[in-house]
């Protein structure tokens, strides 16, 4: 865990280091994704590693799918962390030895959960990956659209501009949640709470 803290400190320090001469990407290549969802102020289209410098739309869509998925998971993780920090825990015990859910720490839980519980978690994640968090029907309107013709929640009642804004909001909140859950993890390892006591 100390390694994770040190790595995050190095990454933070690297953000303020002088820029190195990186491989130049042409303006035309960057323009291919300049109007895509997520190219928003203050950064605009941001690809410092040149992952989509070749203008490959399929690669861009795959990376966007991964970003949306991790953003959604991070939003759930932040809410889960805050709920646990507020003292809300499941009642009862997690195993036959009598260990209660309240005794299990937040991020150190993987060391405390019985092997059978971890197998259940991995199975559940596999079910989500294979049958829920993907476009099964081929009817997706955009990358990350997992409605699969089953649920809508009124999405189709919005005009195209409102849908674009809502997708941009989700993407930004997912990005913020990824940074937020990382901050919670680092501060827990440091023994410092980000939340008021």
UniProtKB/Swiss-Prot annotation:
Subcellular location: Plastid, Chloroplast thylakoid membrane
Gene Ontology biological-process annotations: photosynthesis, light harvesting
Alphabetically ordered keywords of this record: Chlorophyll, Chloroplast, Chromophore, Light-harvesting polypeptide, Membrane, Photosynthesis, Photosystem II, Plastid, Thylakoid, Transit peptide, Transmembrane, Transmembrane helix
Residue intervals passing through the bilayer: 73-94, 113-133, 174-196
Molecular function GO terms recorded: chlorophyll binding
Listed InterPro entries: Chloro_AB-bd_pln, Chloroa_b-bind
A Pfam family it matches: Chloroa_b-bind
Xref: SUPFAM superfamilies: Chlorophyll a-b binding protein
Membrane topology per record: Multi-pass membrane protein
Any one GO cellular component localisation term in the record: photosystem II
Residue interval of the organelle targeting sequence: 1-31
Disulfide topology: none
Tree of life domain: Eukaryota
Family: Belongs to the fucoxanthin chlorophyll protein family.
Record function comment: The light-harvesting complex (LHC) functions as a light receptor, it captures and delivers excitation energy to photosystems with which it is closely associated. Energy is transferred from the carotenoid and chlorophyll C (or B) to chlorophyll A and the photosynthetic reaction centers where it is used to synthesize ATP and reducing power.
Subunit structure and binding partners: The LHC complex of chromophytic algae is composed of fucoxanthin, chlorophyll A and C bound non-covalently by fucoxanthin chlorophyll proteins (FCPs). The ratio of the pigments in LHC; fucoxanthin: chlorophyll C: chlorophyll A; (0.6-1): (0.1-0.3): (1).
Record-given protein name: Fucoxanthin-chlorophyll a-c binding protein C, chloroplastic
Organism encoding this protein: Phaeodactylum tricornutum (Diatom)
Gene symbol of the encoding locus: FCPC
